[in-house]
Amino acid sequence: MIVGIGTDLAEVARFEQLLARHGQRVARRMLAAAELDEFARAADPARFLAKRFAAKEAFAKAAGTGVRAPVLLPAIAVTHDELGKPAFACSAVLHDWLTARGVQRMHVSISDERTHCLAFVVFEG
């Protein structure tokens, strides 16, 4: 059964501006520790952040809370399997919170074009 759906669209230029204005501090506020190494190697840091932000915002919408404790951006890591399929890894606190609300599986799709990144998230129970 579907227990939550969320989608988000992020403009890459917005993240270019954020990086120009605030530097690496933006990444440290948005990314989980596991994502920071991948960000450091990213060929296009603004696009990397835009994709992660869209996925995390869509996650927060599927959770039905928006971004507020325990659904915080650094508590959500966007990972991928060996074929590149995106997935989520959550902090222990967030994982327990989701489990208590009946979320058993999470699905995420991320797409990007030159100017925008889009993410769609489904929570199953």
Swiss-Prot record:
One of its GO terms (cellular component) is cytoplasm. It comes from the Bacteria. GO terms for biological process: fatty acid biosynthetic process. It is found in: Cytoplasm. Its cofactor is Mg(2+). It catalyses: apo-[ACP] + CoA = holo-[ACP] + adenosine 3',5'-bisphosphate + H(+). Keywords: Cytoplasm, Fatty acid biosynthesis, Fatty acid metabolism, Lipid biosynthesis, Lipid metabolism, Magnesium, Metal-binding, Transferase. SUPFAM superfamilies: 4'-phosphopantetheinyl transferase. Its main location: cytoplasm. Mg(2+) binds at residues 8, 57. It is an enzyme of class 2 (transferase). One of its GO terms (molecular function) is holo-[acyl-carrier-protein] synthase activity. InterPro entries: 4-PPantetheinyl_Trfase_dom, 4-PPantetheinyl_Trfase_dom_sf, ACPS, Ppantetheine-prot_Trfase_dom. Its EC number is 2.7.8.7. It holds the Pfam family ACPS. NCBIfam families: acpS (TIGR00516), pantethn_trn (TIGR00556). Transfers the 4'-phosphopantetheine moiety from coenzyme A to a Ser of acyl-carrier-protein. Belongs to the P-Pant transferase superfamily. AcpS family. This is Holo-[acyl-carrier-protein] synthase. It comes from Laribacter hongkongensis (strain HLHK9). The lineage of its organism: Bacteria, Pseudomonadati, Pseudomonadota, Betaproteobacteria, Neisseriales.
